[in-house]
Amino acid sequence: MKLERVAILVGAAWFAQPALGADAAPPLVLTGTQAAYSLTVALTAGTPIQVQNVPADGRQLALLKDYIERRMDSLTPTFVSATAVVSLTNALPGDPLYRFAREANIRIVDIEAAVPWSINAPGVGLAETPTSTVAWGKDADSPETVVAPYFWLSVSNAIRMGDLVAEDLVALFPDHAAVIGTNLETLKRSLLKLRGEYQDRLIDSGADVVFALTGDFVYLTNDMGLYVDGYFIKQDVRWTDADLAALTKHLRDNAIKVVIHKWQPSEAIQKAVSAAGAKLVVLDAGDPGVVVERALAKDGLQQILKKNLDAIVVAAGE
């Protein structure tokens, strides 16, 4: 992406940013997810652009609509003063931030961080939510969504999101194009370094094959070259003794070391995994994110990517 080329935005004249005077408030950009927040903070470092997540301490995406709806009166001044929102709505219609912000401020710009408004720009790679693939999983749960939601867990997608956000930030704030461009390159290098380091460690640890009790991490496994031997997706309370026995047998027969999940499951499931000599690894989808002192961590996305990969590598080496 050539950041020197400032993209033409609809109604650009409305949003031209004057030079900051002594009493002028710095530009404000809003986000609603950890991924959007971390990427936007990284891209605007060293500029006067302020980035604020709504709310500051984060919310699960599924709860964000209710949170904003109940506080619309108190949030309206924030929406009115903001120049842009970094949203994921085109990929995840459940992201409500831009809709509420626009209700308060018709001039606010929607920076789409996943599926861009431009008809010529590619978006992030999206995958379908996995379903159970094992022979014994005939009564497994159906996925809640067709498109798997946590696409920021792919380093490739995180980089693409950075590209998309940076391009629109440059269009909105051309005076800071050089700094944003430098920040983008720094962000890309750090993410590529992280992926390269862990790909080597995963190969060395023998953790190139995993079994999944959730479909939430399809982007992570695809991006890191991890082969998912099988999926079995079923609420804990619905597991039968036959399910537990079948899981243990499958893990043992296929010498699988690592089983990934999105939460700590029931004791019975944990015992079924350990009986096969495998390790259960609970991963973080980044929703709502990393909260430190009642605020999302600026580098929360990077922390989550590293934490997840560390957990898989450590489990495989035990």
Task: Give a label for each model feature.
Residues 1-5:
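Positively charged n-region of N-terminal signal peptides that target proteins for export
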